[in-house]
């Protein structure tokens, strides 16, 4: 299995739905023996330029380990979800588990809570 990093930009009006989206995508990944190593909810942030006449978006970062088949399925889900403004899937060489610079500027308690959540999801397998 390969390691991937996914960044999602969700429509700001759908910010309340982000946790359900993450849960849905997490089950797709974990049901196919994939593992989520890092999950960060960066919250609503200002865009550097308007996308679809929007100036803000809700950002989510996911680092995971999964097969190509799972990534193809996940890519299809991301493409056809109207709430997702943009998504980027990158293949990375190594597992990344430490907090990103975007989250380091926020409260460290939030980071540990998110990491605990992803560890609980992975331990359920």
UniProtKB/Swiss-Prot annotation:
Biological process terms in GO annotation: translation
Domain of life: Bacteria
One GO CC term on file: cytosolic small ribosomal subunit
Keyword Repeat set for record: no
UniProt similarity note: Belongs to the bacterial ribosomal protein bS6 family.
Functional note: Binds together with bS18 to 16S ribosomal RNA.
Protein name in UniProt: Small ribosomal subunit protein bS6
Organism encoding this protein: Baumannia cicadellinicola subsp. Homalodisca coagulata
């Amino acid at each position: 299995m390969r390691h991937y990093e996914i960044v999602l930009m969700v429509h700001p009006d759908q910010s309340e739905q982000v946790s359900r989206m993450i849960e849905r995508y997490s089950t797709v990944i974990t049901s196919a023996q994939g593992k989520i190593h890092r999950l960060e909810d960066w919250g609503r942030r200002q865009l550097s330029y308007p996308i679809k006449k929007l100036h803000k978006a809700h950002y989510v970062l996911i680092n995971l380990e999964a097969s190509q088949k799972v990534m193809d399925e996940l890519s299809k889900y991301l493409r056809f979800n109207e709430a997702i403004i943009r998504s980027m899937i990158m293949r990375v060489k190594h597992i990344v588990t430490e907090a990103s610079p975007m989250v380091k500027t926020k409260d460290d308690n939030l980071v540990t809570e998110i990491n605990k959540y992803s560890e609980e999801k992975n331990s359920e397998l």
